[in-house]
């Protein structure tokens, strides 16, 4: 379970508020996970635990899934603020 300490913080990285950055964020996270899995070769148990946690987060649509944005969940209130989006 040593390799899990490098995978679990990835789930805590928040998505950007600006919807224009969601694609680049998901590409970065996908490439990071792919390079991590190829370089470190985590054990099967750690990989399964991480994939189960990722599936549960994305399936529940909490809004922190980096693979896609759930259509049911609205944008945060600060996403409509031009001061935040314009930065």
UniProtKB/Swiss-Prot annotation:
Protein name in UniProt: Apoptosis inducing factor BLCAP
Taxonomy, superkingdom: Eukaryota
Keyword Metal-binding on entry: no
InterPro entries: BCALP
GO cellular component: cytoplasm; membrane; nucleus
Principal location: cytoplasm
Role of this protein: Acts as a tumor suppressor; induces growth arrest at G(1)/S checkpoint and apoptosis via RB1-dependent and p53/TP53- and NF-kappa-B-independent mechanisms. Modulates expression of genes involved in the regulation of proliferation, cell cycle and apoptosis.
Other remarks on this protein: Down-regulated in cervical carcinoma tissues. Expression in stage III-IV cervical carcinomas is significantly lower compared to stage I-II. Down-regulated in bladder carcinoma. Down-regulated in renal cell carcinoma. Down-regulated in colorectal cancerous tissues.
Topological type in the membrane: Multi-pass membrane protein
Subunit organization: Interacts with RB1 (phosphorylated and unphosphorylated). Interacts with STAT3; the interaction is promoted by cell stimulation with IL6 and phosphorylation of STAT3.
UniProt record similarity statement: Belongs to the BLCAP family.
Entry's localization field: Cytoplasm; Nucleus; Membrane
Lineage: Eukaryota, Metazoa, Chordata, Craniata, Vertebrata
GO process terms (BP): apoptotic nuclear changes
Pfam family, one: BC10
Annotated TM spans: 19-39, 43-63
Tissue/organ expression: Cervical tissues (at protein level). Urothelium (at protein level). Endothelial cells of urinary bladder vessels (at protein level). Urinary bladder stromal cells (at protein level). Cervical tissues. Kidney. Ubiquitous.
């Amino acid at each position: 379970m040593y390799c899990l300490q490098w995978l679990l913080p990835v789930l805590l990285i928040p998505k950007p508020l600006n919807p224009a950055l969601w694609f680049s964020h998901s590409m970065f996270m996908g490439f990071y996970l792919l390079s991590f899995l190829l370089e470190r070769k985590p054990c099967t148990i750690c990989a399964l635990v991480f994939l189960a946690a990722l599936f549960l987060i994305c399936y529940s649509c909490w809004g922190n899934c980096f693979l896609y944005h759930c259509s049911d969940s609205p944008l945060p209130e600060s996403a409509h603020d031009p001061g935040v989006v314009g930065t």
